[in-house]
């Protein structure tokens, strides 16, 4: 009988802003998050009817990432951000994950990261070096995508 008191592995939801992340780095992003726990949810949000999302399509099946459709109903509004935030809150209250990885360089996720941390969740942010400082600081850990790219 094993009496070791190892802490349980953190279950992560990886939520990717498809309008604001690089498809070619999906495998590297998932590998990075897996260092901190088990990834149980992998989603990328965007308007899959737009040409902008075409480059994502080959990376989805290779990395077992679920595409989440969000139509752009109004020009100038980012419906993707709203959909991702709503799903994150649903996951928070569902209680099936202890950690979140928010993949975006968008400061609109700052309040979400703060709220998730207030509830005791571990938050990893992943984005470009140009990511606004408030979002970076709102996360427990922030990984710059430039550091994921192999030379």
Where are these regions (language model features)?
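Acidic beta-strand-to-loop metal/phosphate-binding motif
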Residues: 45, 98-105, 112, 116, ...
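Conserved alpha/beta core segments of nucleic-acid transaction machinery
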Residues: 146-151
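VWA/integrin I-like adhesion module and closely mimicked acidic/polar interface patches used
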Residues: 113-144
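General alpha-helical segment detector with a strong preference for membrane-spanning helices
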Residues: 21-23, 110, 144
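Short beta->alpha linker loops
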Residues: 20, 48, 79, 104-107, ...
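Conserved acidic residues
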Residues: 12, 98, 140
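Short acidic loop-to-helix transition motifs that present clustered carboxylates
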Residues: 84, 107-109
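Domain-level signal for Mg2+-assisted phosphodiester chemistry and nucleotide/NA-binding surfaces
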Residues: 1-93, 114-115, 122
């Amino acid at each position: 009988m094993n009496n070791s008191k190892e802490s349980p592995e953190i279950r992560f939801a990886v939520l990717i802003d498809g309008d604001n992340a690089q498809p070619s780095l999906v495998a590297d992003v998932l590998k990075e998050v897996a260092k901190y726990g088990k990834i149980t949810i992998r989603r990328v949000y965007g308007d899959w009817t737009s040409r902008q999302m075409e480059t994502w399509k080959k990376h989805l099946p290779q990395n077992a990432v679920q595409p989440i459709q969000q139509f752009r109903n109004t020009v100038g509004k980012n419906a993707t951000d709203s959909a991702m935030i709503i799903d994150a809150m649903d996951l928070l209250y569902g209680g099936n994950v202890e950690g979140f990885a928010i993949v975006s360089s968008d400061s609109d996720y700052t309040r979400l990261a703060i709220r998730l941390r207030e509830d005791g969740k571990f938050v990893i942010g992943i984005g470009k070096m140009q990511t606004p400082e408030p979002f970076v600081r709102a996360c427990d850990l922030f990984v710059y995508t430039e550091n994921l790219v192999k030379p």
